[in-house]
Amino acid sequence: MNKDGTVVLMNELASYASDPSKTRGRRHSEPPPENRTEFQRDRDRIIHSNAFRRLEYKTQVFVNHEGDLFRTRLTHSLEVAQIARTLARSLRVSEDLTEAIALAHDLGHTPFGHAGQDELNACMRELAPQAGGFEHNLQSLRVVDELEERYAEFNGLNLCFETREGILKHCSATHARQLGAVGERFLDRTQPSLEAQLANLADEVAYNNHDVDDGLRSGLITLEQLQEVGIFARHYAEVARRYPQLAPRRATSETIRRMINTLIVDLTATSLARIRDHAPASADDVRRAPPLAGFSAAVRREADELKKFLFDNLYRHYRVVRMTTKVQRIVRELFQAFLGDPRLLPPDYRREQPQDQARAISDYIAGMTDRYAIREHRRLFEMG
């Protein structure tokens, strides 16, 4: 916002922003784009990828076929990208890079959400320990580096270093050493770009608040229970006072809208204050500083309270636990079947070496949608 109160419509990059003209490059050399920046090209490649389209049929919390209005990984990624762009514009960093990271952050997610990821990781560690485990964050990087097959001259999407690094929210030292330059910050304990920090926090804002919406729609949590959560109770009371005749469904939507706005406004103000305190003059200064993007202490407590409420009351609800048990069995039985007899796999996923075969199986399962995994399981284990 300008001094006269008008909203900034064009984002003039700050000195501490990631500059697309100064990118650290791509894994494979390419001519520069003619009518886009390097980060815009990354964003566009992500949107046009097969992995991005498959997110439409992958779970956020509820299995994909359970309801048309529940969020999927695709709708979640779009919501994260919208919040991330808003934050990037306010802090005068690259909207395109922030958006690209936000859109790509879940490309490596398995079917069935975190339940599928946890079970696939357990299978890899128990049944193929020589191959290493499975982590969706690393898988997202693997998707954009190796697994996408769209271009004649290289595997993957050949994204910029800054986008690839931003996709990695966390990484063990062992994996970081294997990844080379993109994993260096996990070894020298420096920070990612401000764009990556904002995309990460936008993810948190989106899933916490939108899981409240989906939880209420499903009937697994209630308005009465949410009165125990400070940030929800405060905004819901404000909405009830101002709009006493409003139907509960619309009052809830208005409450969630206000909660998201509270988090974005606080995150923006707190991050700008940290930037003023540390005065980074370049993107490299951002890396050497403490985390510059974040919530105030008070709002962080409220966000953590909401997160704990969702964990205790939604993610551990008995109906969710029942579905978790079912989908974990599907993932495990698929993995065991393919590992026991690789001839069951499509030819492109068969490998000579055992550790390579296990990784190819995890790639195959991780790339499945919820519906495809269920159908594949039926084809293998049901008669008819």
From Swiss-Prot:
Annotated Basic and acidic residues bias: 28-39
Keyword hit for Hydrolase: yes
Keyword Heme: no
Molecular-function GO terms, alphabetical: dGTPase activity
SUPFAM superfamilies for this protein: HD-domain/PDEase-like
CDD domains from the UniProt entry: HDc (cd00077)
Taxonomy, superkingdom: Bacteria
InterPro entries reported for this sequence: dGTPase (IPR006261), dGTPase-like (IPR050135), dNTPase_2 (IPR023023), HD/PDEase_dom (IPR003607), HD_domain (IPR006674), PHydrolase_assoc_dom (IPR026875)
One Pfam family linked to the record: HD
Keywords, comma-separated and alphabetical: Hydrolase
Span list, region Disordered: 12-39
HAMAP family on file: dGTPase_type2
Protein family membership: Belongs to the dGTPase family. Type 2 subfamily.
Protein name: Deoxyguanosinetriphosphate triphosphohydrolase-like protein
Species, as recorded: Bordetella parapertussis (strain 12822 / ATCC BAA-587 / NCTC 13253)
Lineage of source species: Bacteria, Pseudomonadati, Pseudomonadota, Betaproteobacteria, Burkholderiales
